[in-house]
């Protein structure tokens, strides 16, 4: 048994999805999917990346990974026909196809969003949802702002200038915006973009962007939840109150929403209905309690419900115990079907802190709550053979109980509970055919292929005439330039994070600054020798887009590489420093941004920028 653990070293490429698909295929072939200690698992750079994605913090999904409406979805029926997969039963296999329940999940979500305004007669208010007509991923939004198509942006806990890629392009985009709203706990490069090095006094006079800065609360200054990569939904308690005039997120967002709705009521608008009819049934509308929000996301009954199999009844107004209770007739609401069961009539499952692990498999079933259904290992039916017996009898997860005619185990079975092994139901219940897939529907082909980064020092050895991903998105503004070895860019550069710093935040914290006080460029010993470079000397790193200046840290950690018979060097630069922070404000850095070096190139599936491999030249500063 073995797991594959990855982080942004795999994802931040123009072919990142291809790399992860390769890992998934390998684990399927090895039988390591659905088994404790197996799978393909992501290490996240933030503590709640999983939760943000679950709740649709990206443009192309709704909460619970429901598909977003598109312009051709003229009504709810059309939307469901497009997004609800048809069950496929290959050969002798049966299929559960749990996404066939999409209508129940979608209607319950619309009821949570619009309450009484969502009725069968008006298609459950489906047409209140915006229709996504193009790619609104992060890089595209900033590119549109640069081109003058986006007039303003809300940046909540997001330092857009630093995040990149091509920070200079992001700075220039903000110069063209009409307005910018930043909610942060420190002044940062985005909220003070006009202070970027290189902006002249004359240019400053021409920047007409109105900037609003809202004092937010840090993660320790508010209640809330984190969802880790194992899908554990865990409640956290406030450690200390926000200082001064700082406010928690829900109070800030509710204040803005209520004011916008008030303006729509007074002044009308092109299509005010979604704003005017948004359901906001909270005890304190100006500062909704997170417990109320969590209960709404879990879901509740809007009418008395009865399970025909067990005769169990749930009264109107009661919390739902699980997503099997969700209906498509308007009698239930739920903000995210995957979280249904997290806050029930029995209480807040997400606040549990039981440390017992009777199976010894690291399941910890009573610690917080894991979606879906408190299941700790997804697709755990695959841990058994065709007869329902565990492949590893000493590490049993689930199994078929012939006497009880049901699946039982140390974990919640991820399967149709009463489907006996003889029915040959496929274990991968979220796929319409119930099987694991070696071929998938990706934008760049059904099977992984090796591609080089957009900026690469050699041709692709497999197919030199097509070195990089053929469907990768390359931008064509005047700032979008790409380097080649022929132009003198013959050193590979990568970016990374440090253990001692947390993205672009802790450079404002004296303790972290004491640990690593200033930026550096990590240079291989052999490259430094060839340059006559000593550790501590300043270097200038230049890409086709901009330059970066910092002290060199000469190391043997990054080794020279032999590529196509040639010795090639790679350097590394941590991402954390910019032109605002303790060291920057004390003029102890050059105030350059590492993402001024990186190209605006994104993976065609996940739309992740290519930070991990690009070309530069390096010289003494």
Q: For the regions a protein language model found, what residue spans apply to each?
A:
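Long, contiguous, secondary-structure-rich segments that constitute the structural scaffold
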Residues: 251-307, 408-421, 428-434, 439-461, ...
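Active-site rim elements
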Residues: 10-13, 239-245
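Phosphate/diphosphate-binding loops
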Residues: 182-188, 193-195, 203, 241-257, ...
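Aromatic-residue-lined binding/catalytic grooves and analogous aromatic/hydrophobic interfacial grooves
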Residues: 5-7, 380
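Extended redox/cofactor-interaction regions of prokaryotic respiratory oxidoreductases
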Residues: 28-210, 215-223, 311-529
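Flexible, glycine/charged-enriched surface loops at secondary-structure junctions
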Residues: 3, 34-41, 266-274
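Substrate-binding/catalytic subdomain of NAD(P)-dependent oxidoreductase enzymes
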Residues: 7-14, 43-47, 51, 294, ...
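Glycine/threonine-rich phosphate-binding loop and adjacent beta-strand/alpha-helix elements that clamp
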Residues: 209-212, 219-241, 575, 600
């Amino acid at each position: 048994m073995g797991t594959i653990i990855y982080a942004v070293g795999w994802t931040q490429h123009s072919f990142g999805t291809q790399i992860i698909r390769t890992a998934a295929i390998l684990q399927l072939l090895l039988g390591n999917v659905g088994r404790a200690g197996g799978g393909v698992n992501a290490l996240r750079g933030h503590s709640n990346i999983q939760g943000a994605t679950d709740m649709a913090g990206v443009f192309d999904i709704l909460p619970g990974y429901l598909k977003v409406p598109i312009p051709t979805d003229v009504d709810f029926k059309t939307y469901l026909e497009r997004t609800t997969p048809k069950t496929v039963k290959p050969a002798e296999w049966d299929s559960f196809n749990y996404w066939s329940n999409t209508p129940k999940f979608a209607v319950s979500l619309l009821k949570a969003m619009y309450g009484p305004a969502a009725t069968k007669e008006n298609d459950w208010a489906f047409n209140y949802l915006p229709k996504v007509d193009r790619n609104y991923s992060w890089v595209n939004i900033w590119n549109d702002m640069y081109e003058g198509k986006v007039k303003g942006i809300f940046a909540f806990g997001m330092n857009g200038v630093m995040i990149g890629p091509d920070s200079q392009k992001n700075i220039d985009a903000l110069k063209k915006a009409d307005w910018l709203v930043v909610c942060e706990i420190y002044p940062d490069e985005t909220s003070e973009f006009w202070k970027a090095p290189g902006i002249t006094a004359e240019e400053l006079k021409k920047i007409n962007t109105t900037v609003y800065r809202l004092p937010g609360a840090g993660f320790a200054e508010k209640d809330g939840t984190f969802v880790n990569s194992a899908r554990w939904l865990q409640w956290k308690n406030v450690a200390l109150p926000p200082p001064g005039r700082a406010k928690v997120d829900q109070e800030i967002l509710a204040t803005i929403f209520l004011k916008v709705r008030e303006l729509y009521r007074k002044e009308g608008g092109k299509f005010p209905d979604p704003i005017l009819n948004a359901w906001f049934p909270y005890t304190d509308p100006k500062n909704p309690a997170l417990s109320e929000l969590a209960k709404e996301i879990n879901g509740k009954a809007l009418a008395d419900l009865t399970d025909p199999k067990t005769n169990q009844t749930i009264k109107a107004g009661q919390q739902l115990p699980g997503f099997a209770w969700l209906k498509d007739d308007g009698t239930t609401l739920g903000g995210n079907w995957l979280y249904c069961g997290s806050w029930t009539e029995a209480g807040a499952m997400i606040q549990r802190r039981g440390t017992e692990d009777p199976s010894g498999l690291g399941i910890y079933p009573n610690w917080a709550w894991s979606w879906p259904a408190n299941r700790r290992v997804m697709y755990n039916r695959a841990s058994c053979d065709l007869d329902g017996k565990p492949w590893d009898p000493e590490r049993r997860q689930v199994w078929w109980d012939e006497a009880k005619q049901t699946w039982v185990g140390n974990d919640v079975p991820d399967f149709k509970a009463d489907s006996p092994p003889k029915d040959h139901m496929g274990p991968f219940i979220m796929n319409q055919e119930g099987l694991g897939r070696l071929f998938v529907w990706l934008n760049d082909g059904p099977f992984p292929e090796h591609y080089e980064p957009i900026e690469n020092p050699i041709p692709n050895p497999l197919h030199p005439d097509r070195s990089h991903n053929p469907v990768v998105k390359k931008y064509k503004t005047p700032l979008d330039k790409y380097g080649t070895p022929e132009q003198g860019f013959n050193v590979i550069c990568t970016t990374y994070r440090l253990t001692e710093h947390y993205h672009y935040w802790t450079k404002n914290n004296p303790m972290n600054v004491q640990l690593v006080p200033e930026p550096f460029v990590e240079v291989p010993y052999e490259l430094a020798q060839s340059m006559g470079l000593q550790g501590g000397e300043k270097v200038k790193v230049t890409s086709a887009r901009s330059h970066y200046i910092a002290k060199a840290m000469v190391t043997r950690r990054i080794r020279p590489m032999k590529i196509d018979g040639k010795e090639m060097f790679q350097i590394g630069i941590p991402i954390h420093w910019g032109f605002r922070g303790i060291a920057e404000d004390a003029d102890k850095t050059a105030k350059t941004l590492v993402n001024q070096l990186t190209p605006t190139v994104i993976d065609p599936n996940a739309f992740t920028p290519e930070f991990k491999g690009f070309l530069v030249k390096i010289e003494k500063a």
